[in-house]
């Protein structure tokens, strides 16, 4: 017998299989590196704005080895026009830490990821679930919207973020984690959009 939690999760990944935005550039050739760059670029920025910046960035720095040689100025130059330049500076700082502390290998645990500048719980969860296919919750703006509406969580309450993290963790399945994570972000961006 399926629980309400399983029904929610399976509905999300079934929706993704039929309607998901699989043509986005960061959903091709998926790696921890490409997920990281896309997630940082997508913070507080619309998908349509990010696409050309992501494409240019990946053309110049297609992998962590290429990025490891980049100067902060080169990264900032590619970021020009995207805004929120602190994100680009965090990418530079994080790649330096990865080079020194992780032998230029992308971290693969939650604790390692959140130790890097600019990577919080949700970005770490996205990297782990999308690139590594590990069961980790995420809670970006789109996911907050989906879960808060589904479970009638009042976002104006102080404890709402903790409640949403608990629900996100509860709903995050152990199977089809890639489809679920991409799906819940897409549902929030396309169906359950901002009012």
Which sequence ranges carry the predicted segments?
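Catalytic cores of DNA base-excision repair glycosylases
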Residues: 2-6, 11-195
